[in-house]
Structure formats: structure tokens, C-alpha cells
């Protein structure tokens, strides 16, 4: 029986990566729980290595299928677009839960918090120092990633590389400043609901910045190897959508937690 069919859809081959990815994720979570209970972090590191290797090889296969084998046809790309859109929508609701927790606690502070917000004993960050600089950095990175998209659409190879490089650089700079802010923070995640909501919301956003930076870095390497064209570059578009989503979430974080919540 022939495995070929007269349709435009990509029927993927058998792959070990979903299995190894599941093993890596389970090992990582198990190792993290062990680490929390003062055990060795070896299992956690092993899980991360398995997961990273799986991600690299899985994405390598997808890049090969879409770039060299021509398997990402227009209907397949349309399905990928809808998948990315639904993924970003799910991420929106993920962050809505953190904003809900923050506003629930700040708009009706309990007696245990002294019925004030920020709670007694909490010294919040000055919103016009590092947080404002981080806002400017992410807004600038949104401009550079749009510059990269327009350059790619115009087949300007050099400017696409330059703008993607600046975007990745700004993402790394943001992460460094966020790490410095955490180190210098006058409160911790254990300091009542303010510390919990602050570090969980900004921490998950910081994780998304790291993911987005990695996403754009891969796009930079792929573009340097001529994987993208002006008409076939959904991998880059997905990274740009994700990065703009990260920008918008940060604006809400800055306005609600750093500025209004202060």
C-alpha cells in the first residue's frame, strides 16, 4: 500500500522526540521536587539536558521538513498559524489568572495585611527606575523585531540580521536587569501575598522573555543559513507574534503591579 496521498497535508513520520520530551519533562519536574526538599540537583540537571537535546533535534527535523523537503504547504502553514494563535490566547488567560490574584488582593486587602496596599512592611520598587528602563527596552525590541519583519519581506538580508541581532541583545539585557532587580529586591516570594503575586507574575513573564529570546536567536541562525524567504517565513512570524505578546504583557505588569500597585 502506498504511503503517498493526493492531498496538501503533511503526515508526519514516526518520531522518538515526543517520548524523549515526555521523559525529559518528567525527569525535570521530579528532580525539581527533589531539589526543593534539599536533595541533590543532579536529576533536575539531567532532565534539563534531555529536554534541551530533544528540543534541538525535534526543531531540527521540523526545520528540515519545512525548509528543504517542502512539506509545509499553504494549508499546513495555515494550520500552524492557527495553532500559534490559539497558543498565545491560552497564554493570555494564563497571565489573566495572575492579574486576577493581584487585583483581588490589592483592591480588597485583608485584616492580616493591615487593610492597606502595599501591605505593611513591604517596600515596593520605584517604578521610574529599573522597571521603566525595562519597559523602554522591551518597547525598543518591539520596534527592532518589526524592522526585522519588514526587512525580511523586502528581501534585505543584511538588515534582517542586524535587526534580529539587536532584538536578541535587548532581550538578554532585559533578563539581566530583571535578575539584578530580583537580587536587590527588599522582599521575597515568601513575604505575604504581595511578594507571591509579584514574583510569580514577573517571574513567569521573565521566563517567557527567555523563551522568546531563544526563539528569535534560532530565527537569527536560520536566517543566516538562508532558511527564510519573503514569502515563506512562518517560523519568524511566530517568534515575532510571541515577542509582541511578551511586550504587551509587560506593559500591563508595569502599569498594574509596578506603578498602580505601588
Curated annotation (Swiss-Prot):
Catalysed reactions, semicolon-separated: 4 Fe(II)-[cytochrome c] + O2 + 8 H(+)(in) = 4 Fe(III)-[cytochrome c] + 2 H2O + 4 H(+)(out)
EC number: 7.1.1.9
Main location: mitochondrion
Location in or out of the cell: Mitochondrion inner membrane
CDD domains: Cyt_c_Oxidase_III
Role played: Component of the cytochrome c oxidase, the last enzyme in the mitochondrial electron transport chain which drives oxidative phosphorylation. The respiratory chain contains 3 multisubunit complexes succinate dehydrogenase (complex II, CII), ubiquinol-cytochrome c oxidoreductase (cytochrome b-c1 complex, complex III, CIII) and cytochrome c oxidase (complex IV, CIV), that cooperate to transfer electrons derived from NADH and succinate to molecular oxygen, creating an electrochemical gradient over the inner membrane that drives transmembrane transport and the ATP synthase.
Self-association state and partner proteins as the record states: Component of the cytochrome c oxidase (complex IV, CIV), a multisubunit enzyme composed of a catalytic core of 3 subunits and several supernumerary subunits. The complex exists as a monomer or a dimer and forms supercomplexes (SCs) in the inner mitochondrial membrane with ubiquinol-cytochrome c oxidoreductase (cytochrome b-c1 complex, complex III, CIII).
Name of encoding gene: mt:CoIII
GO molecular function, one term: cytochrome-c oxidase activity
Organism encoding this protein: Aedes aegypti
Protein name as annotated: Cytochrome c oxidase subunit 3
PANTHER family (alphabetical): CYTOCHROME C OXIDASE SUBUNIT 3, CYTOCHROME C OXIDASE SUBUNIT III
Family listed: Belongs to the cytochrome c oxidase subunit 3 family.
Keyword annotations from UniProtKB, A to Z: Membrane, Mitochondrion, Mitochondrion inner membrane, Translocase, Transmembrane, Transmembrane helix
Amino acid at each position: 500500500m502506498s504511503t503517498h496521498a493526493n492531498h496538501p497535508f503533511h503526515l508526519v513520520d514516526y518520531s522518538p522526540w515526543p517520548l524523549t520530551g515526555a521523559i525529559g519533562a518528567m525527569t525535570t519536574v521530579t528532580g525539581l521536587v527533589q531539589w526543593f526538599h534539599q536533595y541533590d540537583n543532579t536529576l533536575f540537571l539531567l532532565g534539563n539536558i534531555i529536554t534541551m537535546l530533544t528540543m534541538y533535534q525535534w526543531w531540527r527535523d521540523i526545520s528540515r521538513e519545512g525548509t528543504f523537503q517542502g512539506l509545509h504547504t499553504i494549508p499546513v502553514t495555515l494550520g500552524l498559524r492557527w495553532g500559534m494563535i490559539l497558543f498565545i490566547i491560552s497564554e493570555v488567560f494564563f497571565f489573566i489568572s495572575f492579574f486576577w490574584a493581584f487585583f483581588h488582593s490589592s483592591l480588597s486587602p485583608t485584616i492580616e495585611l493591615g487593610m492597606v496596599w502595599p501591605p505593611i512592611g513591604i517596600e515596593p520598587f520605584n517604578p521610574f527606575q529599573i522597571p521603566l528602563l525595562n519597559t523602554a527596552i522591551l518597547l525598543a525590541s518591539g520596534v527592532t523585531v518589526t524592522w526585522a519583519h519588514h526587512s525580511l519581506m523586502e528581501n534585505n538580508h543584511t538588515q534582517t540580521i542586524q535587526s534580529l541581532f539587536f532584538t536578541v541583545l535587548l532581550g538578554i539585557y532585559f533578563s539581566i536587569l530583571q535578575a539584578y532587580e530580583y537580587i536587590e529586591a527588599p522582599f521575597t516570594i515568601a513575604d505575604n501575598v504581595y511578594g507571591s503575586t509579584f514574583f510569580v507574575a514577573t517571574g513567569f513573564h521573565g521566563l517567557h522573555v527567555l523563551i522568546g529570546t531563544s526563539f528569535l536567536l534560532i530565527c537569527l541562525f536560520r536566517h543566516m543559513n538562508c532558511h527564510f524567504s519573503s514569502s515563506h517565513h512562518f517560523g519568524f512570524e511566530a517568534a515575532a507574534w510571541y515577542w509582541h505578546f511578551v511586550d504587551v504583557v509587560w506593559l500591563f505588569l508595569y502599569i498594574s503591579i509596578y506603578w498602580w500597585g505601588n
